[in-house]
């Protein structure tokens, strides 16, 4: 890779290319091929989908490099992989494997409860989760090229992704309405770096794409998140924990593209079989909420 490949402009541009698409979690080459054939713009290679990570408990780490390489060899679309928050070496290992993006992810057990990675030190672009403009701006300042809502992974429950997307967008509108001399106080109150807030105010949006993630389980869920302003959709457990992964994958891709065509979404939703089993958020203990990881 050349030095140009790792510049902020190129990293953000690579992420921008995924806009409007669906990124699917996969655990092997067969699932990766299903995702690609269904129209996914990228896949996320990991050992277990979030629902299985949640069910298993314990410590969840970076996937075995063999799985990542197997997925990379099976598809022509970009391949992402997750590292633990703050785990310098997992990130370097994934970079050495040649993945297209690294997700510093709260789905895995954090390695560092104080520091996130300085993503500017890496050639590969990073994806990070956020719940509000403070988290979004901090990750951007660290060098994230793509954001996504945290939602509540592995639950099949869209409510938290909706909450986070609405929160971020409401705060963007608030920042856009502030005078520049009011931004420093806003930065202090939210923990958002002042320079990033200035950029958000100037653009009227985040300077990087923001996808929906964490609870997307149906075509209607995907369309909902697009209508709320998502730039695209991550689907973790929703595809391969459903009754018919191939049908669900195609339907979610189509619904993401045609998110205002309600007749099409109705047609896509017919005869899909059962969606993944969902979890009511109020039944989760605080320590079971993955969205609380990171800051």
UniProtKB/Swiss-Prot annotation:
UniProt KW keywords: Lyase, Pyridoxal phosphate, Schiff base
Binding site for D-glyceraldehyde 3-phosphate: 166
Pathway: Cofactor biosynthesis; pyridoxal 5'-phosphate biosynthesis
Top-level taxon: Bacteria
Protein EC: 4.3.3.6
Record-linked SUPFAM superfamilies: Ribulose-phoshate binding barrel (SSF51366)
A Gene Ontology molecular function term of the record: pyridoxal 5'-phosphate synthase (glutamine hydrolysing) activity
Catalytic reactions of this protein: aldehydo-D-ribose 5-phosphate + D-glyceraldehyde 3-phosphate + L-glutamine = pyridoxal 5'-phosphate + L-glutamate + phosphate + 3 H2O + H(+)
Catalytic class of the enzyme: lyase
GO biological process: amino acid metabolic process; pyridoxal phosphate biosynthetic process; pyridoxine biosynthetic process
Quaternary structure, from the entry: In the presence of PdxT, forms a dodecamer of heterodimers.
HAMAP family reported for this sequence: PdxS
Family under the similarity heading: Belongs to the PdxS/SNZ family.
Described function: Catalyzes the formation of pyridoxal 5'-phosphate from ribose 5-phosphate (RBP), glyceraldehyde 3-phosphate (G3P) and ammonia. The ammonia is provided by the PdxT subunit. Can also use ribulose 5-phosphate and dihydroxyacetone phosphate as substrates, resulting from enzyme-catalyzed isomerization of RBP and G3P, respectively.
Protein name: Pyridoxal 5'-phosphate synthase subunit PdxS
Organism whose genome encodes this protein: Bacillus mycoides (strain KBAB4) (Bacillus weihenstephanensis)
Lineage: Bacteria, Bacillati, Bacillota, Bacilli, Bacillales
